[in-house]
């Protein structure tokens, strides 16, 4: 559930609708700026970020909405996930974000696509302090062009030059 395209009222509505439909796994993410996507002229919303969305989920689970109104019926219960970029240039910044997300209620993490296993292993050595499961993101690039596109347009993903060269050679 990305915060980029919806305000808090819409996000809360999406969460309550998901609960009514029996969807109980929620991956909370801020989302990339619209300039990075295929509609760069669109205005992003970003009323909430991933941490405040996790807080919102916990609030709904307590039986209260963002307006302070009590929910009717049984409050929803979600399995709350968040995103982390283990191959980021700033591992310490990612760990600090991870800590804030855990404090906000994240129960598991999904990584951005990992193309540098050594960096991922080093990250996980530090991230294990949080005691939360981490699911590694895997993308198999179909071409050098796809890998280059991800490097240029997808935040938190870096396909190493060596892999780009291998993909170019595998035409």
Please name every model-derived segment.
Residues 1-9, 78-93, 167-171:
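Active-site mouth loops of central-metabolism enzymes
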Residues 23, 77, 131-133:
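A generic structural signal for alpha->beta connector loops
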Residues 7-15, 33-54, 60, 64-69, ...:
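Active-site-adjacent beta->alpha loops and helix N-cap segments on the catalytic face
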Residues 1, 26-28, 80-84, 102, ...:
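Hydrophobic faces of well-ordered beta-strands that scaffold small-molecule active sites
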């Amino acid at each position: 559930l990305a915060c980029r395209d919806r305000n808090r009222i819409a996000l809360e509505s999406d969460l309550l609708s998901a609960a009514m439909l029996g969807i109980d796994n929620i991956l909370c993410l801020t989302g990339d700026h619209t300039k990075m996507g295929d509609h760069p002229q669109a205005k992003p919303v970003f009323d909430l970020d991933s941490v405040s969305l996790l807080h919102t989920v916990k609030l709904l689970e307590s039986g209260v909405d963002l307006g302070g109104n009590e929910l009717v019926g049984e409050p929803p219960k979600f399995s709350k996930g968040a995103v982390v970029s283990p191959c980021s240039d700033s591992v310490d910044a990612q760990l600090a974000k991870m800590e804030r997300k855990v404090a906000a209620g994240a129960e598991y993490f999904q990584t951005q696509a990992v193309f540098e296993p050594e960096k991922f292993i080093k990250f996980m050595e530090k991230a294990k302090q949080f005691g939360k499961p981490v699911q590694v993101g895997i993308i198999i690039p179909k071409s050098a062009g796809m890998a280059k596109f991800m490097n240029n347009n997808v935040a938190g993903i870096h396909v190493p030059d060596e892999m780009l060269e291998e993909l170019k050679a595998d035409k």
